[in-house]
């Protein structure tokens, strides 16, 4: 009997030691995945609803209401592996929703690193349904609180590409129109914009 108890005690101690050595399971991700199916291929993104709740909710509203279906990637700035591509509603009054509150990178902790999605805007708080995808690292687009004058709020990152950066690079490398666009955007508009066929949540 004593021997049986000793064996059970040893087994329990071994089990307890194993539990103590087992690292805790990582917290489940709260990111929402969205597939942008374009004429150039699929771009799969993870939308950070926990870190950028206002901006993420706005983007997902466009997705759920199918407001991105049939829109375009229309702008490409930079080289083939550094810069950004821009797409979305293009201020189409039939597509855009009211502007949202600006969430700077100093608030969200997100940055304009490779594959980041961020909202296009004019003044802070004017973003609606246009966004851009970053290739490479572009810290100048982050909030710059040390900048004493002017707009130092940067752009609002809310998601990252998890698959399909080759598609993003192909869009950026596509030929640009020498005449389309106004002001700083002249020469940055794609000669043949890439259609976003659908934008859908995926598992």
Label each PLM-derived region with a short phrase.
Residues 2, 18-203:
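Cyclophilin-like peptidyl-prolyl cis-trans isomerases
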Residues 5-16:
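Bacterial N-terminal signal peptides
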């Amino acid at each position: 009997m004593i021997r049986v108890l000793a064996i059970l005690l040893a087994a329990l101690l071994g089990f307890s030691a194993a539990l103590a050595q087992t690292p805790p399971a990582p917290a489940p991700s709260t990111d929402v995945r969205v597939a942008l199916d374009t004429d150039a291929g699929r771009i799969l993104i993870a939308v950070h609803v926990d870190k950028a709740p206002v901006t993420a909710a706005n983007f997902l509203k466009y997705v759920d209401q199918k407001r991105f279906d049939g829109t375009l990637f229309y702008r490409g700035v930079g080289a083939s592996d550094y810069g950004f591509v821009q797409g979305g509603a293009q201020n189409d009054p039939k597509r855009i929703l009211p502007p949202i509150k600006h969430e700077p990178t100093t608030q969200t902790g997100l940055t304009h690193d490779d594959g980041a999605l961020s909202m296009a805007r004019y003044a802070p708080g004017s973003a609606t349904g246009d966004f851009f995808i970053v290739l490479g690292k572009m810290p100048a687009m982050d909030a710059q609180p040390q900048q004493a004058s002017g707009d130092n709020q940067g752009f609002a990152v809310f998601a990252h590409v998890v698959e399909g950066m080759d598609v993003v690079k192909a869009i950026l490398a596509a030929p640009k129109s020498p005449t389309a666009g106004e002001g700083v955007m002249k020469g940055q508009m794609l000669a043949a914009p890439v259609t976003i066929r659908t934008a859908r949540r995926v598992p």
